[in-house]
């Protein structure tokens, strides 16, 4: 096995029944080693007809209830989630030669949670949430710049920019979490946790 992956998944299979503990361990290591955006993940969604789409978003929180990101609710992903709450996340940390895939169901976070995170953002980011009609077509770039200036004039007090109703967070409650380690000669290691109907986690090693 690659030296960077000294924590073998076979040992995790024997010792760890909680996938969140393993996620936390890997995520903390990624924050120390990944050069750019260790919280970046590929988010896969689909329409109610099953047409898929994927994009990069940033993880902004997690606990045993799920994994949280924020977005414009009227964006393409927002509209797809409203139609079909089933989604998947994939973290890939090249510096560690590790990957985590998460499958689950999305639900909107509470308003108070969204408000608290929104208020922690930089002023320009909060203004951007008002100005950008995410995923809609622009006549030109100037249209967006004018919208930014409009909302800067409207909300000149940087400490008093309310959260737009069209902007909030989504929480992915996982039903499966798979951990992947790079191995020599493509003999990778895979460990998958699945949530049972009794709300308990089972685990199994998978062939690469």
Language-model features, listed with the residues they occupy:
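Binding-site signature for planar aromatic cofactors or substrates
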Residues: 1-208
């Amino acid at each position: 096995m690659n030296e960077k992956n000294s924590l073998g998944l076979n040992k995790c299979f024997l010792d760890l029944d909680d996938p969140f503990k393993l996620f936390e361990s890997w995520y903390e290591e990624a924050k120390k080693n990944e050069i750019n955006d260790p919280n970046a993940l590929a988010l896969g969604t689909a329409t109610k007809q099953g047409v898929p789409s994927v994009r990069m978003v940033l993880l902004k929180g997690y606990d045993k209830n799920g994994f949280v990101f924020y977005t414009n609710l009227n964006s393409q992903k927002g509209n797809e989630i409203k139609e079909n709450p089933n989604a998947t996340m994939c973290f890939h940390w090249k510096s560690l030669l590790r990957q985590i895939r998460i499958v689950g169901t999305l639900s909107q976070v509470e308003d108070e949670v969204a408000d608290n995170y929104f208020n922690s953002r930089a002023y320009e980011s909060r203004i951007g949430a008002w100005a950008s009609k995410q995923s809609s077509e622009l006549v030109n770039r100037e249209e967006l710049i004018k919208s930014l200036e409009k909302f800067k004039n409207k909300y000149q007090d940087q400490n008093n920019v309310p959260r737009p109703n069209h902007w909030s967070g989504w929480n992915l409650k996982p039903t499966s979490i798979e951990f992947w380690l790079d191995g020599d000669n493509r003999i990778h290691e895979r460990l998958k946790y699945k949530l049972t109907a009794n709300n308990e986690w089972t685990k199994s090693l998978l062939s690469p």
